[in-house]
Amino acid sequence: MTQLDQLKQFTTVVADTGDFQAMRAYAPHDATTNPSLILKAVQKAEYRPLLEQAVRDARSDSVEDIIDAVLVAFGCEILSIIPGRVSTEVDARLSFDTAATVAKARHLIALYEARGVPRERVLIKIASTWEGIRAADQLRAEGIRCNMTLLFSLIQAVACAEAGVQLISPFVGRIYDWYKKDAGAAWDPIAQGGANDPGVQSVVRIYNYYKRFGYTTEVMGASFRNTSQIIELAGCDLLTISPELLAQLQQSDAPVERKLSPEHAHATNLVRLPADEAAFRWHMNADAMATEKLAEGIRLFAADAVKLEGLIGPLRAAA
């Protein structure tokens, strides 16, 4: 049995790509996208017709509306392949605007529903800022489920759980990158790999906290640099994995053991954290890694949104 098949015994496997042709071979249950992945996909020749059709289908000739149509078009194609849910991301430039995030999420869900997709099959991805978490809280009350992304700390996870969000995406690889860069020449990839990987440890801590205190918010590990990080999180509710790493898992038959479980989580000595706004901002301020990676992630996603707009401009003019 391949490592991928073994992993699926413990964890829901999610494809982390906008390239829906690439995900067919791995039979994922869900799929996630983000501005960077969509940008990468739309530059492939095979997706040009989909892009051009989205331009024609947009409700107006505004770039913003066309981008929304592109995101939903990709999401619908992905949903025709997978049995579960697709995550579609709100523009990162709205990360500090609760009202605008709520409005954009409602609009994206309306576009999906206009194409016959029930809202239960869509997760709206929102950056895990305080403002984004408040937006997710409002959207939950309307039956709109959210996937909180760019999550690098326990306090972000606790605030999301207290808001009752559907799912969080704690990042692994970007945390690993930060600590590796911070350590410089002192970094020891052997000593700080496997279960000692700081990104892995972050997700384990969050998973254990949720299970120990009975939160129903799903934990989906994300942002992997290698298959070792994935294997160390076997048993996590979900893991979203790039096609490249899915291929490596499919090509290996090395044993995979369950590492995370509710039973183990209940035996930990974790204590509850307050998660009001003051506590959230204080804990984030005290965590240089989480603060820097959240800000960087928002900047990178925003930059790719701008690049995507640049690709849309000529198509709009030609339509």
Curated annotation (Swiss-Prot):
SUPFAM superfamilies: Aldolase (SSF51569)
Primary location group: cytoplasm
CC terms in the record's Gene Ontology section: cytoplasm
Keyword Cytoplasm found: yes
Entry's localization field: Cytoplasm
Job of this protein: Transaldolase is important for the balance of metabolites in the pentose-phosphate pathway.
Name of the protein in its database record: Transaldolase
Lineage: Bacteria, Pseudomonadati, Pseudomonadota, Betaproteobacteria, Burkholderiales
Gene name per UniProt: tal
